[in-house]
From Swiss-Prot:
Pfam families according to UniProt: RRM_1
Keyword Cytoplasm among UniProt keywords: yes
Region (Disordered): 26-47
The protein's name in its UniProt record: RNA-binding protein 8A
Chief location: nucleus
Residues in RRM domain copies: 73-151
Notes concerning its domains: The RNA recognition motif (RRM) is involved in the interaction with mago. The RNA-binding activity of such domains is therefore uncertain.
Cellular location(s): Nucleus; Cytoplasm
Keyword Cytoplasm: yes
The species this protein was found in: Drosophila melanogaster (Fruit fly)
SMART domains, sorted: RRM
GO biological process, one term: import into nucleus
Length: 165
C-alpha cells in the first residue's frame, strides 16, 4: 500500500511564529561587500597611488611620471648594438648605483641582441641618475636611449567633467 501522511497529529509540527522577521533580521545584520578584497575605503586607493608614483617636491600633488615595479626601478634601454653583451651594459650603468638585474633579450636564431635591455636599480635616485647621464650615450659606437620602463600617464578627465567646462 501507499504511504499515507497523518495530518491529524498537527501537534508534532512546530509553527514558526516569527515568520519572515527572522530572515529580515539576518539580512539587516549582513554587510554588503563589493569587489576584490571587499575594500570600499577610499584611503586604500590613495595609498596605492602614492606608492606607485614619485611626489613632486614643489607641492604635495602627485604628478605623472615613473612608476615603481614590484622589485625596483627599471630603466628601458633601446638602440643597443646587436653584438652588445650584458657585461658592456653593466660596465656602463654600474657607475650610478648597484644594479639589481639586467635583462638583455637575445634573438634565438642569430644569437644577437634584439636591441633593447632592462636595467633594474633598487632606488629611484640611482635609476634617475643613470637615466639622465646615459640617455644619448654610446655603447659600442651606437647611441642609446634610456627611459623609464613603467610610466604612469597623466590623470584622465572623466567625460562628465569635460562637459562641465
Amino acid at each position: 500500500m501507499a504511504d499515507v501522511l497523518d495530518i491529524d497529529n498537527a501537534e508534532e509540527f512546530e509553527v514558526d511564529e516569527d515568520g519572515d522577521q527572522g530572515i529580515v533580521r539576518l539580512k539587516e545584520k549582513a554587510k554588503h561587500r563589493k569587489g576584490r578584497g571587499f575594500g570600499s575605503d577610499s584611503n586604500t586607493r590613495e595609498a596605492i597611488h602614492s606608492y606607485e608614483r614619485v611626489r613632486n617636491e614643489d607641492d604635495d600633488e602627485l604628478e605623472p611620471g615613473p612608476q615603481r615595479s614590484v622589485e625596483g626601478w627599471i630603466l628601458f634601454v633601446t638602440s643597443i648594438h646587436e653584438e652588445a653583451q650584458e657585461d658592456e651594459i653593466q660596465e656602463k650603468f654600474c657607475d650610478y648605483g648597484e644594479i639589481k638585474n639586467i635583462h638583455l633579450n637575445l634573438d634565438r636564431r642569430t644569437g644577437f641582441s634584439k636591441g633593447y635591455a632592462l636595467v633594474e636599480y633598487e632606488t629611484h635616485k640611482q635609476a634617475l641618475a643613470a637615466k639622465e647621464a646615459l640617455n644619448g650615450a654610446e655603447i659600442m659606437g651606437q647611441t642609446i636611449q634610456v627611459d623609464w620602463c613603467f610610466v604612469k600617464g597623466p590623470k584622465r578627465v572623466k567625460k562628465s567633467e569635460k562637459r562641465r567646462r
